[in-house]
Structures are given as C-alpha cells and as structure tokens.
Amino acid sequence: MGRMHAPGKGISQSALPYRRSVPTWLKLTADDVKEQIFKLGKKGLTPSQIGVKLRDSHGVVQVRFVTGKKILRIMKAMGLAPDLPEDLYYLIKKAVAMRKHLERNRKDKDSKFRLILVESRIHRLARYYKTKSVLPPNWKYESSTASALVA
C-alpha cells in the first residue's frame, strides 16, 4: 500500500510468526498476560507500549496468540481503553507541536505545509473512525482545542 503524502510504496513490514500457536517455552498463561495488561494499562501505557513491554520483558510474542484477543479489546473489557484511538492521538499531538513551532518561527513555510498534510491525515482518520463508530458522529478536530485533547 502506498504512502499518503510521500512517493514511497511502503513495502517494508514486520513478518508475523509462521506458527500461530503459543511457544512451548512461554510459561505465562492467558490470565497472567491479562493481569500484566491491566497493570500496565493502569499506569497509563498505550496498547502498543504494552505490547512492546510484554514482548521485551516477558517474552510474549503476540498477545493475540496467547489470549485469543488483541490488547485493545482486553483493555476495553477492563474499562481501560483510551477515549481517542492511539494513531489519531499521536497525529493530534504532532499537529499541536507543529503549531507551537510555527508560533515561534512564523516564516517556516515547509512546516506550515507539513502541518496542512498532518491535519488532512487527522480529518481523514477521524472520518474513518466515525464510520466505524469509534468516535461519536459529532466529534470534530479543531486546532484551537487540540492542545486540550493531548494534554
């Protein structure tokens, strides 16, 4: 699949393990993994940060293979899911940082152009999440209130 605002094709990606069964050397059960997700979610970590932490320190290759559910679904069941989807949150955070930069550097034309691209990605992603009912239908991105969303 091609990139949205770049000429690259985006063919590089991580390969999923061939076998979808739980490795024999993994001593954690599904309940142990869910408990770890609960603890890390309480600390305020995002689903991808939780996945990295479980992979690096506990040896859980794919949470879905062990528990049968993805991390975000487990967090939703426990009531720990973030109110904004993670990718949208980080795009808004990037746009807020770019606006702050543009306040200090008014003549930075390239950053102004890149901000337009980032905000168009935000609008496109928000439209997708509204159709999937992840966001409420009246949710709207506004640059004036964006810093409050990511604070």
Swiss-Prot record:
Disulfide feature: none
Q: Which GO terms describe its cellular component?
A: cytosolic small ribosomal subunit; nucleolus
Q: Which terms does the record give in the GO molecular function aspect?
A: small ribosomal subunit rRNA binding; structural constituent of ribosome
Instruction: Tell me the InterPro entries matching this sequence.
Output: Ribosomal_uS15, Ribosomal_uS15_arc_euk, Ribosomal_uS15_N, uS15_NS1_RNA-bd_sf
Among PROSITE patterns, the record links this protein to: RIBOSOMAL_S15 (PS00362)
The Gene Ontology biological process terms listed for this entry are: translation
Keywords in alphabetical order: Ribonucleoprotein, Ribosomal protein
SMART domains of this UniProt entry?
Ribosomal_S13_N, Ribosomal_S15
Q: What is a single Pfam family found in this protein's UniProt entry? A: Ribosomal_S15
What residue ranges carry the coiled-coil annotation? none
PANTHER family (alphabetical): RIBOSOMAL PROTEIN S15P/S13E, SMALL RIBOSOMAL SUBUNIT PROTEIN US15
UniProt lists the family membership as follows:
Belongs to the universal ribosomal protein uS15 family.
The name on file for this protein is Small ribosomal subunit protein uS15
* Species this protein is from: Choristoneura parallela
